[in-house]
């Protein structure tokens, strides 16, 4: 093992020897008091490298007068990263799915370039003394050594490349280090998870261009992201990729049965590939209502002539809170006031649907009957309630037990999601570490979860790229 790879494998782990100070809690042994546990967690949190693989951005917050040096109402900004001890933010070039036409591709491309430019503006002009852009895992470690926060660029949705595979290299050259081939809605490259629930799969997995894009990403050293494409597209991507893949912000479907989460078959395939799932702290993917409740609510609404409404919450308004594209509109800079409301999640919502929309159309008598029936459903199938950090770590636990500690990481989907009680902004990141310590994870394991596994995969993707480029000479 060469020295550079060794450094990447230990990145995010303890600076001092793990075993000298703490040992993993074991059943039957006395657990530390809350005071001791918090003290232990604080030391670990300070020593490991903390990396979040998915933070959406709004170009309006990357200007000289309004930017991440300020404590904005955004879930991620430099003051909140510093407060929560977060070191690395993958800032996302996201473009929502649109028509598969030259006009649609052109508009998506312009939106993507505006977001690339925004991140470069932050790291090169607005705050180069506070945050730097990393293009390699080695850059991450070097910037961290300089006590700087670190930005990395991820691309959510391959839609903006249109039908021009040369744009994959252009996006790589602009700093993109991972890309998902679809978002919500089938793209020209891959089917979306939404196609599973809607019963419409445009490509039956990956398109021929999508397969070529994966090969090009492997050649360049860009990580293939499985979050958002359909299961069929993901299984095909894992099969085709010559490098380890990632799921940048997904949950466990066994614990929250939504199409955006990964089932056991996908997780096991990801493990075999050598990849990593970055378990997401988006409430709607962490904790869902039971199938029985969802079905009962749907049946009740149909009976009363009301439009369908998901009992899971968080599906409406996918575009809200995800950030502007190529236009920066005039609006007040969203600086957070000391007495203002707490940071909120993105526009997709994180609450549970209770099934009471559209009741204004009912008569008073019918509405009373509806409310009575709804109360009966609530009693028989209680709503899930808001997701907590404990619920979030349950997903980590499940994935670790199924595929091993080396294939699991952490992400938030902040400023496009969030909503988990106790971890709803970068400022609250310590609460995740504290819960991991409470569960008995060691410092080495927590380092792997927060950053070590992702950096290992990224490094291996680079190695595959170097090998493929040599073979093509």
Provide a role label for each language-model segment:
Residues 2-14:
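Bacterial N-terminal signal peptides that target proteins for export
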Residues 19-203, 253, 257-473:
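N-terminal hydrophobic targeting/anchoring segments and the immediately downstream early-domain regions
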Residues 54-56, 228, 249:
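Histidine-centered divalent metal-coordination motifs
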Residues 187-195, 205-206, 230-240:
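Active-site-adjacent beta->alpha loops and helix N-cap segments on the catalytic face
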Residues 202-217, 237-247:
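Alpha-helix-loop-beta-strand connector modules within alpha/beta enzyme cores
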Residues 212-226, 232-236, 270-271, 394, ...:
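Substrate-binding cleft of carbohydrate-active enzyme catalytic domains
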Residues 239-249, 253-255, 260-261:
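His/Asp/Glu-rich metal/cofactor-coordinating catalytic motifs and the adjacent surface-exposed loops
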């Amino acid at each position: 093992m060469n020295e550079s790879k060794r450094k990447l494998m230990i990145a995010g782990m303890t600076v001092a020897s793990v075993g000298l100070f703490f040992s993993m809690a074991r059943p039957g042994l006395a657990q530390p008091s809350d005071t001791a546990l918090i003290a232990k967690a604080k030391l670990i949190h300070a020593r490991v490298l903390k990396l979040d693989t998915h933070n959406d951005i709004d170009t309006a917050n990357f200007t000289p007068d309004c930017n991440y040096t300020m404590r904005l109402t955004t879930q991620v900004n430099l003051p909140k990263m510093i407060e929560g001890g977060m070191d690395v933010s993958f800032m996302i070039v996201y473009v929502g799915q649109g028509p598969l036409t030259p006009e649609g591709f052109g508009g998506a491309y312009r939106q993507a370039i505006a977001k690339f430019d925004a991140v470069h503006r932050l790291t090169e002009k607005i705050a180069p003394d506070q945050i730097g852009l990393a293009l390699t895992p080695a850059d991450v470690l070097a910037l961290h050594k300089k006590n700087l926060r670190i930005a990395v660029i991820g691309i959510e949705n391959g839609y903006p490349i249109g039908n021009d595979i040369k744009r994959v290299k252009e996006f790589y050259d602009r700093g993109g280090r991972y890309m998902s081939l679809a978002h919500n809605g089938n793209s020209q490259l891959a089917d979306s998870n939404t196609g599973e629930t809607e019963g419409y799969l445009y490509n039956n997995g990956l398109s021929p261009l999508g397969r070529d894009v994966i090969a090009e990403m492997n050649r360049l050293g860009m990580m293939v992201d499985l979050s958002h494409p359909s299961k069929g597209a993901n299984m095909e991507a894992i099969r085709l990729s010559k490098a380890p893949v990632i799921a940048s912000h997904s949950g466990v479907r066994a614990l929250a049965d939504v199409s955006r989460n990964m089932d056991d078959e996908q997780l096991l395939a990801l493990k075999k590939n050598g990849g990593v799932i970055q378990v997401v702290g988006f409430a709607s993917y962490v904790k869902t209502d039971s199938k029985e409740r969802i079905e009962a609510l749907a049946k009740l609404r149909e009976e009363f002539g009301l439009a369908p409404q998901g009992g899971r919450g968080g599906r409406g308004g996918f575009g809200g809170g995800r950030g502007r594209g190529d236009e920066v509109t005039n609006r007040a800079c969203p600086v957070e006031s000391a007495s203002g409301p707490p940071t909120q999640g993105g526009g997709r919502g994180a609450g549970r649907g209770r099934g009471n929309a559209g009741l204004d159309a009912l008569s008073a008598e019918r509405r009373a009957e509806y409310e009575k029936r709804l109360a009966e459903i609530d009693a028989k199938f209680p709503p899930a309630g808001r997701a907590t950090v404990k619920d979030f770590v349950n997903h980590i636990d499940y994935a670790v037990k199924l595929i091993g500690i080396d294939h699991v990481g952490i992400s938030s989907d902040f400023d496009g999601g969030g909503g988990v009680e106790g971890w709803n902004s970068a400022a609250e990141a310590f609460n995740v570490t504290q819960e991991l310590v409470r569960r008995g994870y060691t410092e080495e394991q927590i380092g792997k979860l927060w950053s070590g596994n992702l950096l290992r995969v990224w490094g291996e993707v680079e190695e595959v790229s170097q090998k493929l480029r040599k073979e093509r000479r």
